């Protein structure tokens, strides 16, 4: 009996040991699940420029943007224009739809602030790579492109940028394009930084100017809470200092009243019940990359900056196949509560 009990004990011990050993082997074979960062930026825009964010699958993002006039651009003019509130530098209405979580298409209508007005825009955005939480892949990369056409009446002045002759040539003169490779890192839970190499092509430009221009954008977001953050943008042309009589770096060269100034934007974002609200100050009069990047003539140092706002809201077009946490968001909370 003693030997039987001893044998039984040894069998149970060896069986338990082999089971633990087998579980260890199985755990080694299972690869750890890769986790990606979420909400590097709150919405698909930082301020004027696009962020690496895309619209979620089967959701429609609707946004309205408004830029007022100069706060203090001319002596005493700020009194008569009530610090720019009586004026509208640009207005935009935009719809964007998420075909997948990584692919977004959009259309929009902008008033326009450059020589071409009444701008109709179509864009495509695809997120190629995502940043992982363990930083094994440290950045998110999104590709963006748009096509813009002006529907404004043709000028009678044949030397004007907005002179559109009849036929294909006139139609072509109305078009412009933007391409971007957006690269961002969510460095911490509260800080995100983005680089935006940008190429803008205009089919028709003022005499001596360049059709194609490169820009480099730097954007950042500092999150104070799940619903409040500070946002920043700066776009600088990658070009010779002087092209066709136009100075592209007037501040460095000590030139006043130049025909171009880099774009500097700063603002705050607030989220309330599913709406994301941006309040910002910019020296850009336009809202579209094709418009504000090549045509900005406003100088912060001369009071030529303006108050602006953007309000955006995403609507789920279908709750089918949506995870429960997404459904909870539409009832209450922040878009970042679920992460």
Feature locations, PLM:
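Transmembrane beta-barrel domains of Gram-negative outer membranes and organellar outer membranes
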Residues: 19-156, 160-168, 175-179, 185-191, ...
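Positively charged n-region of N-terminal signal peptides that target proteins for export
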Residues: 1-5
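N-terminal signal peptide c-region/cleavage motif recognized by signal peptidases
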Residues: 13-15
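A mid-sequence, solvent-exposed acidic-amphipathic segment
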Residues: 190, 195-241
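Conserved N-terminal ligand/cofactor-binding loop architecture of enzyme catalytic domains
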Residues: 331
């Amino acid at each position: 009996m003693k030997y039987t009990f001893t044998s039984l004990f040894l069998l149970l011990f060896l069986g338990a040991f082999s089971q633990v050993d087998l579980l260890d082997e199985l755990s080694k074979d299972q690869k750890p699940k890769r986790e990606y960062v979420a909400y590097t930026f709150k919405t698909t825009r930082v301020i004027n420029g696009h962020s690496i964010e895309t619209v979620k699958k089967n959701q429609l993002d609707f946004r309205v943007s408004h830029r007022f006039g100069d706060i203090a651009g001319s002596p005493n003019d700020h009194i008569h224009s009530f610090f720019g509130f009586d004026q509208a530098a640009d207005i935009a209405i935009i719809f964007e739809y998420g075909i997948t979580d990584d692919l977004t298409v959009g259309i929009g209508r902008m008033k326009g602030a450059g020589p071409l007005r009444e701008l109709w825009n179509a864009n495509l955005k695809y997120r190629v790579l995502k940043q992982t939480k363990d930083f094994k892949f440290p950045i998110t990369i999104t590709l963006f492109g748009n096509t813009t056409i002006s529907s404004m009446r043709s000028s009678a002045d044949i030397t004007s940028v907005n002179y559109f002759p009849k036929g294909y040539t006139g139609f072509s003169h109305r078009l412009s394009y933007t391409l971007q490779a957006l690269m961002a890192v969510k460095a911490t839970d509260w800080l995100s930084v983005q680089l935006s190499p940008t190429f803008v092509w205009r089919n028709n430009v003022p005499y001596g100017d360049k059709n194609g221009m490169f820009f480099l954008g730097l954007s950042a977001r500092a999150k104070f809470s799940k619903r409040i953050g500070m946002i920043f943008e700066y776009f600088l042309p990658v070009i010779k200092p002087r092209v066709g009589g136009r100075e592209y770096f007037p501040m460095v060269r000590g030139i006043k009243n130049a025909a171009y100034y880099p774009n500097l934007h700063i603002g705050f974002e607030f989220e309330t019940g599913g709406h994301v609200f941006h309040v910002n100050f910019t020296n850009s009069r336009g809202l579209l990359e094709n418009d504000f990047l090549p045509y900005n003539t406003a100088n912060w140092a001369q009071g030529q900056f303006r108050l602006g706002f953007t309000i955006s809201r995403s609507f789920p077009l279908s709750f089918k196949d949506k995870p429960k946490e997404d459904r909870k968001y539409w009832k209450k909370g922040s878009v970042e509560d679920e992460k």
